[in-house]
Amino acid sequence: MPKMFGTDGVRGLANRDLTARLALDLGDAAVRVLGDAGTQDDQPEGRRRALVGRDTRVSGDFLASALSAGMAAGGFDVIDAGIIPTPGIAFLTSVLNVEMGAVISASHNPMPDNGIKFFARGGFKLPDQKEDDIEAVLGQDWDRPTGAGVGRVSHDQTTATNLYIDHLVATIAPLNDDKTQPKPLKGLKIVADCANGATSVVAPEALRRAGADVIVINASPDGYNINKNAGSTHPEQLQAMVKATDAVMGVAFDGDADRCLAVDEDGNMINGDQIMGILARAKQREGKLNHDTLVVTVMSNLGLKLALKDMGIKTVETAVGDRYVLEEMLKGDYSLGGEQSGHVINREFATTGDGTLTALTLCNEVVKSGKSLKELAADFPQLPQTLINVPNVDKKAASTNKRIQDAVAREEELLGDTGRVLLRPSGTEPLVRVMAEAATQAYADEVCTRLAKIVAEELAL
């Protein structure tokens, strides 16, 4: 039986793969596994609590109701925070000291999909073992509470949202002694593309409270338009709007706002690698980049690593997935990490990738540095990169096939220090991703095409 939890929780087609019944069972199982982390005396009035939030997909309503029902039936009082970014639930799980948090979202996926991910006390995503434990007891009967032992479900989107926005603004603009709000972004004209998703209220409000002049697009969710030709996966509107309005930059979020990409004043995309480079150098300048190290994944561009090396900043690599980035950050006491896709974890303020926090911090660095985003990003040039997905192959054999490994070694020898290759099996599909970076796009294309051909020939199902 295939593993239910993927790299970011449980995902699938809502009402087909991810049903109300499954959401109910997941809530029930999560109570059994995560409820063991503490005793009922840990919480006010002896009741254990869970926090649930969601993005703007229409299926989020019935899935939230079912998930909450499973938790309440297991004896947890559930606070339904309504529509709120994923990192908002992580933050509130920590500050409200609830036993666990859960988010119903499929992030950047199309609207028909949805997903469920959990946070343990403290606001951290679950390790693989805890997800395995939940899966192991899924659907099993157990001695559930009765009578006064069952939980209640309450709804409080306003309080949850306001607490989260206050936190975000305070990361770059803590209140003055007289309780007035500083405006560090005053005069900064930016465009924010909210993907018609969970940060449609949060990001514009946080940026404006910090003083920015914000032009907002794709912030009218209707349940069906999340990520539709909008946000970080479709930045064309943002690029055009930045140029049309003479904004100094733009920021784009995905559906649950755990990632952020940016656009400079000319409409050029600034990816997660470049954003991490800019923020790492800023933290280094302020003495806040622990061990002068940035945590990245194997997908981060070699150009980033070479540029950081010249600045005296080391990089540590992990597998793809912000949960693995965080695990490495905690293990090595590192303060900043992330992914090329725009997940950036700033441990000073967050326990997971937070797109709105990234946008605020990036805007603040533009102001502090006195440079444009284009100028800042230019210090982190990206090597040309080619990625080819090779479908319908035995992905598990990629690392042991001799012809493939010999071909990889040969290409690496030819590239030397001017590029690299990477073969990465998909976590969810029978395919292998072949990536090559080189000094020119043409050479990256050549290398990637040669390797993809060999992978297809050797591993075809």
From Swiss-Prot:
Tree of life domain: Bacteria
Active site: 107
Key words, A-Z: Isomerase, Magnesium, Metal-binding, Phosphoprotein
SUPFAM superfamilies cross-referenced by the UniProt entry: Phosphoglucomutase, C-terminal domain (SSF55957), Phosphoglucomutase, first 3 domains (SSF53738)
Disulfide bond entries: none
Top-tier EC class: isomerase
Post-translational modifications reported in the UniProt record: Activated by phosphorylation.
An example molecular function term from Gene Ontology annotations: magnesium ion binding
Cofactors (names): Mg(2+)
EC number: 5.4.2.10
Modified residues (Phosphoserine): 107
Gene Ontology CC annotations of this record: cytosol
Catalytic activity: alpha-D-glucosamine 1-phosphate = D-glucosamine 6-phosphate
Single biological process term from Gene Ontology: UDP-N-acetylglucosamine biosynthetic process
InterPro entries referenced in this protein's UniProt entry, alphabetically: A-D-PHexomutase_a/b/a-I, A-D-PHexomutase_a/b/a-I/II/III, A-D-PHexomutase_a/b/a-II, A-D-PHexomutase_a/b/a-III, A-D-PHexomutase_C, A-D-PHexomutase_C_sf, Alpha-D-phosphohexomutase_SF, GlmM_bact
Cofactor note: Binds 1 Mg(2+) ion per subunit.
Residues binding Mg(2+): 107, 254, 256, 258
Family: Belongs to the phosphohexose mutase family.
Task performed by this protein: Catalyzes the conversion of glucosamine-6-phosphate to glucosamine-1-phosphate.
PANTHER family per UniProt: PHOSPHOGLUCOMUTASE (ALPHA-D-GLUCOSE-1,6-BISPHOSPHATE-DEPENDENT), PHOSPHOHEXOSE MUTASE
NCBIfam families: glmM
Record-given protein name: Phosphoglucosamine mutase
Species the sequence originates in: Bifidobacterium longum (strain NCC 2705)
